[in-house]
């Protein structure tokens, strides 16, 4: 993730697309009963700020909001992830904390869930 996103003292949230789910039958007790999602960060494209470009890596994140495959979501990482409800004692580094309805960048809607994708 960008170095600016790793500042101390603040809670950073990121956008990601849900690409699938992860099933682990043997796992830490703190993950028992939790849905795991495979998410790919989405970045505003520097060459065309009206579009997203996918990040290079995927991340396994605990789902706290009932997100589904293909949805654009908000996720948080690190100590901020453990601030999500019922995550304080769970061994998590990334948690999906919201499902995105719209994204506006530079005065232009670049994502609208109603049209299922980029505006």
Where are these regions (language model features)?
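Short, Lys/Arg-enriched N-terminal segments with co-localized hydrophobic residues
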Residues: 1-12
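Short aromatic-glycine-enriched beta-strand elements
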Residues: 31-39
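Short, structured beta-strand/loop micro-motifs enriched in basic residues and often containing a Trp
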Residues: 51-59
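C-terminal structural segments of small proteins and small subunits
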Residues: 80-118
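Short, surface-exposed secondary-structure boundary micro-motifs
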Residues: 21, 42, 78-79
